[in-house]
Amino acid sequence: METATLVAIFISCLLVSFTGYALYTAFGQPSRELRDPFEEHED
């Protein structure tokens, strides 16, 4: 394979894994530990 193809595949995999981790952090198990500043603030 050419170098450009390998670099493109590597960057694509990196982007997909970062997106998957961000979705897991936002909606998965760790999301229970996130705080909501709007819920903490009382008017």
Curated annotation (Swiss-Prot):
Q: Its principal location? A: plastid
Cellular component aspect of the GO annotation: chloroplast thylakoid membrane
Q: Which UniProt keywords apply?
A: Chloroplast, Membrane, Plastid, Thylakoid, Transmembrane, Transmembrane helix
GO BP annotations of the record are:
photosynthesis
How does the record classify its membrane topology?
Single-pass membrane protein
Pfam families under this entry? PsbN
Query: Plastid: is it a keyword of this entry?
Result: yes
Per the UniProt record, which residue ranges are transmembrane? 7-27
Location in or out of the cell: Plastid, Chloroplast thylakoid membrane
Q: Which family does it belong to?
A: Belongs to the PsbN family.
- What does the UniProt function comment say about this protein? May play a role in photosystem I and II biogenesis.
Q: What is this protein called?
A: Protein PsbN
